[in-house]
């Protein structure tokens, strides 16, 4: 009985989530580079909206999560309830050097990985897997996803990340 009440309370509270009433951000690709010899890629992009201050409370205040996600394999369902099978993903971070500008510059240190066990774990994709996966693509779609307590999820418009730039970094030789 207690579980039923908790379930009903969760449903009631989730239906009360406010619409953020914010326009969808337009993201523009700037660059991508591999971080040292790690399987981590720094993706830089510009937004016409400050993604980390959507609610006017200050940078990062009131936000539960700020994620940047790119679909690597044609799965374009970016919804919170869905795990994209193969993706580039990471936390949205502000470029401190660009503070107080009319547009905002952000970066994400992204892992290129595959989701396993219904979202319970992830595995980094190998260089060979990434080359095969991206071989016939010109761009891949990416979105910012912001969640905040009491609000519906916020999604940006799609940004197209050039695959040629990503493959250049994936295939960079590593230091001996």
Task: Enumerate the predicted regions with their spans.
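Positively charged n-region of N-terminal signal peptides that target proteins for export
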Residues: 1-4
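Non-catalytic macromolecular-recognition regions in eukaryotic signaling proteins
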Residues: 17-139, 143-176
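C-terminal motif of bacterial Sec signal peptides marking the signal peptidase cleavage site
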Residues: 12-15
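Sec-dependent N-terminal signal peptides
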Residues: 7-8
């Amino acid at each position: 009985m207690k579980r039923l009440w908790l379930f009903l309370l969760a449903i009631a509270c989730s239906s009360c989530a406010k619409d953020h009433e914010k326009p969808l951000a337009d993201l523009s690709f700037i660059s991508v580079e591999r971080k040292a010899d790690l399987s981590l890629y720094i993706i830089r992009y510009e937004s016409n909206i400050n993604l980390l201050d959507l609610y006017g409370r200050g940078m990062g205040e009131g936000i539960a999560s700020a994620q940047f996600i790119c679909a690597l394999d044609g799965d374009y369902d970016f919804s919170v309830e869905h795990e994209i099978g193969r993706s580039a993903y990471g936390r949205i971070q502000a470029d401190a050097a660009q503070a107080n500008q009319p547009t905002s510059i952000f970066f994400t240190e992204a892992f290129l990985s595959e989701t396993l066990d219904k979202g319970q774990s992830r595995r980094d994709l190998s260089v060979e897997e990434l080359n095969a996966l991206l071989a016939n693509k010109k761009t891949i779609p990416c979105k910012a996803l912001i969640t905040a307590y009491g609000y519906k999820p916020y999604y940006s418009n799609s940004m197209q990340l050039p695959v040629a730039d990503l493959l250049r970094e994936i295939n960079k030789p590593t230091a001996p």
